[in-house]
Amino acid sequence: VLPMPCEGSMVFRVIKTNTKKPLEDIKVTLGGNSNDEDGYAQYATPNYISGSFANEKQERYFLMGKYEVTEAQFNAVMKGEQCPSVNMKTSLPAINMSWFDAVEFTHKYNEWLLKNAADKLPTEDGSKGFVRLPTNAEWEFASRGGVAVDEAAFRENTFPMPDGIARYAWSSKNANGRLQVIGLLEPNPLGLFDTLGNVSEMVFDGFRANKLSRYHGQEGGMIARGGSYIKGESEVNNTSRIEVPYYDNNGAMKKKDMGFRVAITAPLLT
């Protein structure tokens, strides 16, 4: 748990990566089996994952926000001394902000932490961790359940949902057309809430199309993951990577069903 301005806090979950050495990484297959129409965005593609920090057993991990960033958290960081009230409305995921706003949030939050709670940040080899948007690979690895699920479950389009998808993800089928307060449904196997549904989540890196078993060389717009409350159940999954332009005709792109969560990592070469 990290403190926030206005006496708030942000909760993180440990995401182990099955690595034990600082430069070790593991191969993970992300995406899924897809038809030709959307294979450019969803087809299974090899990726690599590693962890920034090590526990007492030398198991390496990174940290992922347990919940989507809320309106109250976003405003507490971005508006400085003007502390927002915390109620049902401000406990909804923060929306209608651009990718650039999300990155600015992480920058301002890091500056606040370094000034007010530097001792609370995790460290690796003397270097303090920092908050940023998760990469596409980090997001999908964590949303699928990481090392908490077996290989067969990891490769499914959704993490294990023994009680049915409506108990784990907000979609057009159960959200009644409304954004929902964070954390009301069941979490995924790593204790992360709402990775699927509610709001789609922006990640740090840009969109690349799949080209057979690799990514295309051109990087395009931003990536939105997980589907949202206005999407059907079939669109709320771990495989879909939706490309969203960074800008529209009015400026930086903002959407009513798009938000973000954050991760904590550390410099690679400390």
Regions found by a protein language model. Give the residues of each.
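Extended N-terminal export/anchoring regions of large proteins
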Residues: 1-9, 14-23, 29, 55
